[in-house]
Amino acid sequence: MSKIFVNPSAIRAGLADLEMAEETVDLINRNIEDNDAHLQGEPIEVDNLPEDMKRLHLDDEKSSNLGEMVRVGEGKYREDFQMDEGEDPNLLFQSYLDNVGVQIVRQMRSGERFLKIWSQTVEEIVSYVTVNFPNPPRRSSEDKSTQTTGRELKKETTSAFSQRESQPSKARMVAQVAPGPPALEWSATNEEDDLSVEAEIAHQIAESFSKKYKFPSRSSGIFLYNFEQLKMNLDDIVKEAKNVPGVTRLAHDGSKIPLRCVLGWVALANSKKFQLLVEADKLSKIMQDDLNRYTSC
């Protein structure tokens, strides 16, 4: 009777596929729950109406005063009733942003460029805000306390802005000083820290978000891993990817970035499971080879 031998690496690959399928189902369920989160809020009840509105009564004996009171109410509370009763503009705006986010993900998965999608989305958001949140008329006279508060707020805003400007420079210094994975040579440096670079990195990562990459395992075999298994936001992945030597320069030039190297870098820094599975020395060599191959092109 013949015996059938099964390669251990095939078993490990099958187990990895099953685990990835379970994690994908969990990720889809969490996305569905997050998208429906705004539907679980309690309705807002308006208990206190303006005094002039409380005095409105449908009384035949006071029909002459009714029209006068309505005109007063319209003049005094015109801004309070621009939207339908019971509609909170903040909730509507949050729901609108949720739909915009879902639409962006769909367009990116269909292959559209991120910069084009983002420019169109910004125009739509600005148009929505302009229509539904018009600027209130400025008052001709303000008391001294209001002016003082405005000046203090301006100072706080200026100081906060200066702190935010200093953060990227500090981040670049830390990225240059911090050591990388073992045996990974720092042969390139990050450059051009701007929004266009982040957009290009995000676009390339999003296109390959579900693609599986091979990594060396501690058991002298290989295992498959992708960006979805990180369970991280795309923005956080991009921020971590910018610390990979040479990635920002490649993205600034519009070149392809070494996605397997980026995935290994981010996973090694944020995934304990990945750290337990991967062979660190072999991973460092693979990442260095990928980086050298892409930067030499």
UniProtKB/Swiss-Prot annotation:
InterPro entries: PP_M1-like (IPR004259), PP_M1_C (IPR037199), RABV_P-like_C (IPR049506). The modification Phosphoserine is found at residues 63-64, 162, 210, 271. It comes from the Viruses. Pfam families: PP_M1 (PF03012). The keyword Lyase does not apply. Coiled coil: none annotated. A motif (Nuclear export signal) lies at residues 49-58. The keyword Hydrolase does not apply. One of its GO terms (molecular function) is RNA-directed RNA polymerase activity. Phosphorylated by host PKC and by an unknown kinase. Changing residue 223 to L: In strain: Isolate PM1503. CDD domains: RABV_P-protein-C_like. Belongs to the lyssavirus protein P family. This is Phosphoprotein. It comes from Rabies virus (strain PM1503/AVO1).
